[in-house]
A protein has these predicted regions:
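Flexible phosphate-sensing "switch/lid" loops adjacent to ATP/NTP-binding sites
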Residues: 1-323, 330-347, 354-355, 362-368, ...
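Glycine-rich, charge-decorated loop segments at or immediately adjacent to ligand/cofactor-binding or catalytic sites
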Residues: 180-187, 384-393, 493
């Protein structure tokens, strides 16, 4: 097993995840089996209870674990399904160590950061890699070098090299090379300090990826190589790209796979990026275009809906179409009381969410799409609120609502799941992960081309069974249900060009070569709507 550790310096959010994903993709396209681990040095056990404004989208994996959005990036780039073991947090590590101490596993030792916590981190990496049965494990360490919360993980990086052998472990350090002043001069000083800090921890980077708005100038790259004590060719330039999907080609041009193979003693293999290059070209150069409104409550941070954004782009690439997203804050719709900001869009997407803030704005958008025959896709909360809107304005149940929003409401067409009634804890307690969905027909079966599917879930509420017959008699059909037939999973509206919604999250299984069928259907319907004028 080979391990590639990806660290970051200067500041967070400069592209460690893309560096790691792109490197993994290149090696995968060369024929290696690649897996990935993301380390998050925060005290939360997982990302499940975090506000999207804190870390962006909460990504749900097949096994139901709620993790950092970077894991979604790995799944999309590597076309794989990861598990809870591939996300290591400080909270999870401390929890495991304390439980072992209480259980007596340390046989009376004084439990300390070194060796116990550090060893727990290393064991987590080794177990995740072993379970994946991979040739290479990419390990991304969140945060930046020098952060106090990252120190145990930096020590774990050093220890991993000693335990597994230096020939099996390498470090790629991603750092910022800012461009300063009107003359556009690239500065190396932040990188110098970052590398010095890393070396002071006993970790020597093998490759440095320099993030900058422009390609690294030759003298700048040479200077970085000199003070980092690495060959010039081991300094990789990572300028701003047309899209993140162009980054693997940028790295390939600079022979990154060859550098990795040489450092880790791997047999040289040439990556075949033919399909990926075609995809990257299509995602950036669609001949057609549509605009879809995304009605959210965290739209100031686009990463809150990154899986939806990428799902729409993947669908567009397959349809030779560029998808423009009109980001609309649901509370703004609510406050204004009108839907003028929706005018001119070719489709509407209402994603998942929780709580009353913005709920009425989402209901307004579902009503507008239904009445104006604009293609609509609702997901999770968007599925539930489409049902609330239909109950209010078609069935005439004026007080219809979700029990989440109005616990004492007269018509709770959305009710809490029976198994959730006595749940008190918030973390990892929802109906999560892959569940079977049986599709009986309709547009859903045309899109999925299958009567049985498995999709990822994250919810506490469901359609109230008492109202299903009444709703279906009025034209809203539930064409997807769980295997018991009692839990509603997919709805579609009769007589509408495309009005679909799902209780599950189709965006989490969307891949570059296989976009979510429901997102594909939305983009296709949006194109048809635009064409019909």
């Amino acid at each position: 097993m080979k391990y590639i550790l990806v660290t970051g310096g200067v500041l967070s959010g400069i592209g460690k995840g893309i560096t790691s994903s792109s490197t993994g993709l290149l090696l995968q396209c060369a024929g290696y089996k690649v897996t990935a681990v993301k380390i998050d040095p925060y005290l939360n056990v997982d990302a499940g209870t975090m506000n999207p404004y804190e870390h962006g989208e909460v990504f749900v994996m097949t096994d139901g674990s709620e993790v950092d959005l970077d894991l979604g990036n790995y799944e999309r780039f590597l076309s794989c399904n990861l598990t809870k073991d591939h996300n290591i947090t400080t909270g999870k590590v401390f929890k495991n160590v304390i439980e072992k101490e209480r259980h007596g596993d340390y046989l009376g030792q004084t439990v300390q950061i070194i060796p116990h916590v550090v060893r727990e981190i290393v064991d987590g990496i080794l177990n995740a890699a072993k379970d994946a049965d991979a040739d290479i494990c990419m390990v991304e360490l969140g945060g930046t070098v020098g952060d106090i919360e990252s120190m145990p993980f930096m020590e774990a990086v050093r220890l991993l090299g000693r335990l597994e052998g230096k020939e099996n472990v390498m470090v790629i350090h991603t750092t910022l090379v800012p461009v300063v002043g009107a003359v556009g001069e690239q500065k190396t000083k932040p990188t110098q300090h970052s590398v010095k800090e890393l070396q002071g921890l006993g970790i020597r980077p093998d490759i440095i990826v320099g993030r900058s708005s422009t390609k690294l100038e030759e003298d700048i790259a040479t200077k970085i190589a000199f003070f980092a004590d690495i060959p010039r060719e081991c300094v990789i330039s990572a300028p701003d790209a047309r899209s993140i999907y162009d980054v693997p080609m940028v790295f390939l041009e600079q022979k990154l796979p060859e550098l990795v193979e040489e450092r880790l003693g791997l047999k040289p293999k040439k990556p075949d990026l033919t399909k990926w290059e075609d995809f990257a070209e299509r995602i950036s150069n669609g001949k057609k275009n549509v605009e879809i409104a995304l009605i959210g409550k965290y739209t100031d941070l686009k990463d809150s809906y990154i899986s939806h954004e990428e799902s729409l782009r993947y669908a567009g690439a397959l349809l030779d179409c560029k998808v423009k997203i009109r980001w609309i804050e649901a509370p703004d719709l609510e406050d204004s009381g009108n839907t003028k900001t929706l005018e001119g869009v070719n489709g509407v997407l209402v994603p998942g969410g929780f709580g009353s803030r913005g709920a009425e704005g989402k209901i307004m958008s579902a009503k507008w799409a239904r009445e104006n025959k604009i293609p609509y896709l609702g997901v999770c909360f968007g599925f539930q609120l489409a049902t609330v809107e239909f109950a209010r304005n078609v069935l005439g149940l004026k007080n219809a609502n979700s029990a989440e929003l109005d616990p004492d409401g007269q018509h709770s067409v959305i009710d809490i799941l029976p198994e959730q009634e006595d749940v008190k804890d918030m973390g990892a307690t929802m109906r999560l992960g892959d569940h079977e969905v049986i599709i009986s027909g309709g547009v859903a079966k045309e899109l999925y081309k299958n009567g049985t599917i498995f999709e990822r879930h994250r919810h506490r509420y469901e359609i109230n069974p008492k109202y299903i017959d009444q709703i279906e008699a009025s034209g809203m059909k539930y064409t997807g249900r769980d295997k018991s037939g009692r839990r509603m999973e997919i709805l579609e509206l009769e007589g509408h060009p495309y009005f679909m919604a799902s209780q599950f999250h189709p965006e989490f299984k969307s891949r570059p070569d296989a976009p979510s069928p429901l997102h594909f259907g939305l983009v296709k319907a949006a194109l048809d709507h635009k064409k019909s004028g």
